[in-house]
Amino acid sequence: MTSPQTNSLDDIFGSSPPHEGEKFSQQASIEAPEPSDLPSLRRQHVTAGYRDGVSAAKGEHVQHGFDAGFPIGAQLGMRAGTVIGIIEGLLRGFESPTASRAVKKPLQRKEEGQGVETDEAEAARQAKREQLLRLYQKAVKELEVRSVFAGSEEESTRDNGGQEKPEVVLRRKGDAVISQWEEQVRVAHWEENMAALEPKEDEKRASTPTEQI
């Protein structure tokens, strides 16, 4: 069986039967296009899945992060509060005027040179107060939370590529800052004095009168 004779004008008027390659191209072009709302629907599902994944991850890891980070923050906060409290107590002591004493002595005639010594003592007290005030303002600024933990993320990434636990980095960073202030204020010395002033438990029991039946 011979193939049908092709006419040179078939390409123009389209009277000749289509070839096999032409059938395939025509079928591909006739296929229905993808609905226009399908890409938008896909994006919505991806967004919803992403949000669900974030919520699930938060539920699993937030409690672990709280358990690991809260004790460290509480410990460092107590140490920083002790430093600021000591400086604040000293500052209040120097702010207390001499005239506010509970028992006032009767006025006496000033002897020669007594007024000069009083003025010098007052000037020294004011100078010490100004020094403590500057120290107090500096401590409040440097022991603020953002200042204590500043650069923790960069330090962790630089040292071990972010492999170290965040709470370990925060503890090391905070301890380095607060320890400097503890040495400057001599917190250990103040704690020893406070411990010596506190009555022992045995002394409390001995001084407390026993009830008689």
From Swiss-Prot:
Keyword Metal-binding: no
InterPro entries reported for this sequence: Essential_protein_Yae1_N, Yae1-like
GO terms of biological process kind: protein maturation
Compartment annotation: Cytoplasm; Nucleus
A single GO cellular-component term on record: cytoplasm
Segments for region (deca-GX3 motif): 49-89
Region (Disordered): 1-44, 102-122, 150-170, 192-213
Pfam families: Yae1_N
Signal peptide span: none
Primary residence: cytoplasm
Keywords for the protein's UniProt record, in alphabetical order: Cytoplasm, Nucleus
Compositional bias ranges of the Basic and acidic residues kind: 155-170, 192-206
PANTHER family: PROTEIN YAE1 HOMOLOG (PTHR18829:SF0)
Assembly description: May form a complex with LTO1.
Annotated family: Belongs to the YAE1 family.
Functional description taken from the UniProt entry: The complex LTO1:YAE1 may function as a target specific adapter that probably recruits apo-RPLI1 to the cytosolic iron-sulfur protein assembly (CIA) complex machinery. May be required for biogenesis of the large ribosomal subunit and initiation of translation.
Protein name stated in the entry: Protein yae1
Organism of provenance: Aspergillus fumigatus (strain ATCC MYA-4609 / CBS 101355 / FGSC A1100 / Af293)
GN (gene name): yae1
